[in-house]
A protein has these predicted regions:
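HotDog/MaoC-like acyl-thioester-processing domains
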Residues: 1-3, 81, 85-190, 257-300
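Hot-dog-fold acyl-thioester-processing enzymes
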Residues: 1-81, 153-155, 165-247
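Catalytic-pocket segment enriched in acidic/His residues
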Residues: 225-228, 232-267, 272-274, 283-286
Length: 300
């Protein structure tokens, strides 16, 4: 990335209009295995907690993206963290939002195994009014990590132990998973992941990175094949939380990834109440390794 590109990255994109559609809400809910009736209601369905990650479907072209004018190699782009902060109720079908995206900062770090990682803090804000200057209804923050291609002649990654993202996200404080104290509120195992699951989520969310469904493209990055979209399990975890929290609004939902999930992984979702208004969710692969950890704060 050149210095000119880095400077351009801090120019906010043009705002765009997002009309929340009930068909898209139900599609997203089905793609993320939502057990919540309000997500599939015949009238005025409520958006799932991570639904606004689908905002890219409403972008007309590159001028609406915080990445406008910047080249990205999707073979080497990883998702490190994601956070949603809600300052009001979740949008329902028919809500008209004004959306604006910007890159807040970029910085570099050296990986433990060498090579440079470029971290990008991408912020997407949503307003219910036509303006985009006041406090937003929702703020979505993403940490994206660009890594260097593997060295020439390096063997392709394998699905065991499938730790490809760990080095990349070390700089966002990946820690060993320790069971959180508190009340266990759910413990579920989802069916084994398939590439069809990845494609369904990509269609529902607008994340069309071919690394999640195109074998040749995935292998060109050094991976053995397609792997799960990180936000898929994050959305499933959020839906599990919503089913438990009921009508209590969530103020903040934050996710941090540790390892890739692969086709064939039957992920386990364990939610623990860590305080009067706080939860932690650990999502683990069949071998017990952590795929992601999520934290949520409710308003009551």
């Amino acid at each position: 990335m050149t210095s000119g590109e880095a400077a351009k990255a801090f120019t906010p994109a043009e705002p765009f209009r997002m009309v929340v559609e009930e068909g898209k809400i139900r599609e997203f809910a089905r793609a993320t295995a939502s057990p919540c009736a309000e997500h599939l209601a015949s009238e005025n369905p409520v958006t799932p907690l991570t639904f606004l990650a689908s905002h890219r479907l409403w972008m007309i072209d590159d001028r609406h993206s915080g990445w406008h004018g910047i080249h990205r190699d999707f073979r080497y782009l990883l998702h490190g963290q994601e956070e949603f902060t809600f300052h009001g109720p979740l949008p329902v079908s028919g809500t008209v939002l004004t959306v604006r995206q910007s890159i807040e900062r970029q910085y570099e770090k050296r990986g433990r195994r060498g090579g440079t990682m470029v971290f990008t803090d991408l912020v997407t804000r949503f307003w219910t009014e036509s303006g985009n200057e006041g406090p937003p209804l929702v703020e979505e923050r993403s940490v994206l990590i660009s890594t260097e291609p593997p060295a020439a002649g390096a063997p392709a990654g394998t699905s065991e132990p499938a730790r490809a993202p760990v080095e990349a996200v070390e700089a966002v404080e990946v820690v060993q998973v320790v069971a959180a104290p508190g009340e266990l509120v759910f413990d579920t195992v989802q069916p084994a992941l398939t590439i069809t699951d990845f494609v369904k989520y990509q269609g529902a969310s607008g994340d069309f990175n071919p690394i999640h469904h195109d074998t040749a493209f995935a292998q060109s990055s050094g991976k053995p094949g397609p792997f799960a979209v990180g936000m898929l399990a994050a959305a499933v975890a959020a839906n599990q939380l919503t089913a438990v929290a009921g009508d209590v609004p969530v103020h903040r939902y934050r996710v941090r990834w540790s390892e890739i999930a692969w086709p064939g992984d039957a992920l386990r979702y364990q939610g623990v109440r860590t305080g009067a208004t706080s939860y932690r969710i650990d999502v683990t692969r069949p071998d017990g390794r952590n795929h992601l950890t999520a934290w949520a704060d409710t308003t009551g």
